[in-house]
Amino acid sequence: MEARAAMAMGWYLHIDMDAFFASVEQVLDPSMRGKPVIVGGRNGRGVVTSASYEARKFGVHSAMPGFQAKKLCPDGIFVPNRRRVYSEFSHKVFAILERYSPEVHAVSIDEGIVDLTGTDRLFGPPLKTADQIIRRIETELGLPSSAGLSQSRVVSKIAATLAKPRGLIYVPPGSEKEFLIPLAVELIPGVGPKTHKLFSRKEIKTIGDLLKRPELAARFLDLGEAQRRERRHDHSIGNETTLDKPLRDKEPMEAVLWDLVEEVGSRLRREELYARCLTLKIRYTNFQTISRSCTLPAPTRFDREIFDVVSDLLRQNIGQGRAVRLLGVSASALQSSGWQEPLFTRERRKSWEKLYQGIDALRHKYGENTIGAATPRNRSR
């Protein structure tokens, strides 16, 4: 009876790819395997976007300035950030995840949550399925990953972080609090520097300390989540990239922006969601960071519409010789359907749906670079 009750409550597998960008480079060039690979920050410019575990032994980590990474690891292999290549591998990873569940939610380009509830009839117990998924990703793609499995999304995320690299941590039903109590609060998703300062002022150092403050714990830990089966759309879908070298001109920035938009649009359609709010993130070379948002009259999940909005936001916030080092695009206020729209826009939306269904099908079958719109990136090809 206990086993049946546990199965009824829901299971969440959080998959987190290990040093994803660097691992992809090692797959594409096997001579790099076992060597310190550093993505981004070439020639001491820009920042590191990914470092293999061999490079991390020297203290190199993502978001580190390239010149500092070079000092720490002079023999490191520096490679440029190839966002579209990593996006293609990301799609391959998620295609594997979707073989095991219709409920797969992308957290980022290299992280996803697989709802394994009820899949035991096809694949066996969730723990066995989790192990099989990790092995399949490595066997088919050559990429290492880590995972956490529990009946809470938050617990699974934390478990996946602790499992790195190439590990799987299973948290049995009923043992979630025991698992969490000794852990540092920084491991909780969403706890950044500001929240950490707040916790420090309240002498909250461990998750156990946080659990003693129910009013705060309820905001950051949702351990009763497994008992609720409704699909939530209160998250956002986004991507950002640190540029290998700062950009000042609009056209190359728009080319980068289009790559980000395609990934966001693809993920929205994959999750069958629409976004009513779009946000552009810009970080300048002086590390000033701004975010500009636009609420849409009607939700969208189409690349062209998303690009038109965020490129307008870009044009409004660049110029005067200011160099940009990071760009990001995110979609929020997500919904599945159910809004009223005028007949003429409804017909246009149907034509967009057909167009992007065809585009997504071609990309899924032949790769991300198979087809693209006439954008700043490929007009000059």
Which stretches of residues belong to each language-model region?
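Gly/Gly-Pro- and Ser/Thr-rich, intrinsically disordered tail segments characteristic of DNA damage-repair
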Residues: 1-219, 223, 228, 266, ...
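Residues in well-ordered beta-strands of folded domains
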Residues: 38-40, 79, 115, 238, ...
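Short Gly/Ser/Thr- and Asp/Glu-enriched loop/turn motifs at secondary-structure junctions
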Residues: 107-111, 150-153, 273-277, 322-326
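Acidic, metal-coordinating catalytic segment for phosphate/diphosphate chemistry
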Residues: 298-381
